[in-house]
């Protein structure tokens, strides 16, 4: 059911979800670890590594995968999922700055999200997070297997949304479950708060924004990437995607009923999840700048009275315009990519409502938006080497 997929893919998180996944692995491992820690050895996929290199950890004003691991072990709560670092404090940070030297990071060739953490103390604890930032797939204490759920990329909850078409998703949005709409309201409130915090922060990218839409989106993304200790409602595993697909709808100033605005936000969220099911959760393509913008374009078009054809044209044209905007790691600069996507969503929605769209055959744009999405999937998979090569430059001036 779309309701189940929605609740599985829309969750609050403190901080960028890649270092948070690392912190979650050590926080869970701490429950089983005995005695003083000798070392923490972590193996990651390239995308998780890429997104954790230079993004600030919430509440710390600094960054580092090793630090995230130490914070998770020392003061993380493994029962809080993506909110694992919600309660960190200055004392914990001081201890973690010393402990991070015990953490060793290495890479593997996995193409999906993969965090394999081994904590060596008086005993040895292995924690594997796989497929999703909060999916604890494996727990092994010494040689005793506590949990072992075999991961298959095609069996994740996000894959199930492929059983629906965009028309079916739009139909559901017209008559959604009541608890889903209530949760959308919560998502709007949560993401507005961090955006408003960013707007009132000197030096935030939103300070020079030229309209309200990009001001709110850039403010939220910049605040989150800067390590502000505030929750963000994530969409398909990403807080930036959550901000970029929710805020352009949330701040709409036109005269519309609140329920209509909530439904439009829901459509934006579901379209984002739908496209991410094809591209993958962690990819070489910028989710906040391109995929979420397609969701926002759909939501804005629906909000302004657009029909199914116009909504799908808005999605089609956004993907045709923004595909190729790459992900070179999580950082403050993501705010500028989100700005680019928001501008495009606004423009494309206006064009769609006037029945103006990119002709099929122009670049990757197909006549049927579902075919365009499949082309985006194929092309995303064709640039996998980007993730390896870009690591040569991240963090280096």
Swiss-Prot record:
This is UPF0597 protein Tmel_1007. GO terms for molecular function: L-cysteine desulfhydrase activity. It comes from Thermosipho melanesiensis (strain DSM 12029 / CIP 104789 / BI429). Pfam families: SDH_alpha. Belongs to the UPF0597 family. It comes from the Bacteria. InterPro entries: Ser_deHydtase-like_asu, UPF0597. Signal peptide: none annotated. Transmembrane segments: none annotated. GO terms for biological process: L-cysteine catabolic process to pyruvate.
């Amino acid at each position: 059911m779309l309701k189940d997929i929605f609740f599985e893919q829309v969750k609050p998180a403190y901080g960028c979800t890649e270092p948070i996944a690392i912190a979650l692995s050590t926080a869970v491992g701490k429950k089983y670890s005995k005695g003083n820690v000798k070392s923490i050895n972590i193996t990651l996929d390239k995308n998780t590594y890429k997104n954790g290199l230079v993004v600030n950890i919430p509440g710390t004003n600094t960054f580092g995968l090793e630090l995230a691991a130490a914070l998770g072990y020392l003061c993380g709560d493994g029962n809080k999922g993506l909110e694992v670092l919600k309660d960190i404090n200055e004392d914990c940070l001081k201890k973690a700055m010393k402990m991070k030297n015990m953490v060793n990071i290495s890479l593997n060739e996995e193409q999906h999200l993969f965090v394999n953490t081994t904590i060596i103390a008086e005993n040895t604890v292995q924690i594997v997070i796989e497929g999703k930032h909060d999916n604890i797939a494996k727990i092994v204490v010494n040689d005793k297997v506590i949990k072992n759920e075999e991961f298959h990329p095609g069996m994740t909850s996000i894959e199930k949304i492929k059983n629906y078409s965009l028309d079916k998703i739009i139909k559901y949005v017209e008559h959604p479950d009541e608890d889903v709409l209530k949760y959308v309201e919560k998502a709007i409130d949560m993401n507005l708060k961090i955006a408003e915090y960013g707007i009132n922060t000197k030096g935030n990218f939103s300070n020079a924004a030229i309209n309200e839409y990009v001001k709110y989106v850039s403010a939220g993304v910049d605040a989150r990437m800067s390590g502000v200790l505030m929750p963000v409602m994530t969409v398909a595993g990403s807080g930036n995607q959550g901000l970029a697909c929710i805020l352009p709808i949330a701040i709409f100033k036109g005269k519309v009923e609140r329920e209509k605005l909530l439904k439009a936000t829901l459509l934006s969220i579901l379209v984002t999840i739908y496209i991410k099911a094809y591209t993958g959760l962690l990819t070489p393509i910028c989710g906040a700048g391109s995929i979420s913008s397609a969701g926002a374009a759909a939501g804005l078009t629906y909000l302004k009275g657009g029909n199914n054809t116009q909504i799908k044209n808005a999605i089609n044209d956004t993907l045709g315009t923004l595909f190729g905007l790459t992900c070179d790691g999580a950082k403050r600069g993501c705010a500028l990519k989100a700005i680019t996507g928001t501008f495009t969503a606004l423009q494309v929605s206006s064009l769609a409502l006037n029945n103006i769209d990119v002709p099929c055959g122009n670049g990757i744009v197909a006549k049927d938006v579902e075919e365009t999405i499949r082309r985006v999937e194929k092309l995303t998979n064709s640039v996998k080497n980007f993730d390896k090569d870009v690591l040569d430059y991240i963090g280096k001036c």
